């Protein structure tokens, strides 16, 4: 996934509604408030709490 700043502005954590950051190394979207990492599969962010891993 490319880290388009506009895309990151639009995406929010589905649990907290807070901002997300992109972890280039793990290819995940990180919610610091929820302490969760959302996976990106085939370039598509999976924004389901059930698919997120705890930080």
Curated annotation (Swiss-Prot):
Disulfide bonds: none annotated. Pfam families: Trm112p. Gene3D superfamilies: 2.20.25.10. It comes from the Bacteria. GO terms for cellular component: cytosol. Signal peptide: none annotated. Belongs to the UPF0434 family. This is UPF0434 protein BARBAKC583_1098. It comes from Bartonella bacilliformis (strain ATCC 35685 / KC583 / Herrer 020/F12,63).
